[in-house]
Curated annotation (Swiss-Prot):
One GO molecular-function entry: hormone activity
Protein name according to UniProt: Pancreatic polypeptide
Family per record: Belongs to the NPY family.
Lineage of origin: Eukaryota, Metazoa, Chordata, Craniata, Vertebrata
Main subcellular location of this protein, as a coarse class: secreted
PROSITE patterns the UniProt entry points to: PANCREATIC_HORMONE_1, PANCREATIC_HORMONE_2
Sorted UniProt keywords: Amidation, Hormone, Secreted
Top-level taxon: Eukaryota
Length: 36
């Protein structure tokens, strides 16, 4: 299981926030994928 992305903070550059949400989406896709 991948590590949960760490929120960069409210003062972070927009690029960091975009990257965080991108990583978070990938993370959630892996974590919430059904395991058969």
């Amino acid at each position: 299981t991948p590590l949960q992305p760490k929120y960069p903070g409210d003062g972070a550059p927009v690029e960091d926030l975009i990257q965080f949400y991108d990583d978070l989406q990938q993370y959630l896709n892996v974590v919430t994928r059904p395991r058969f």
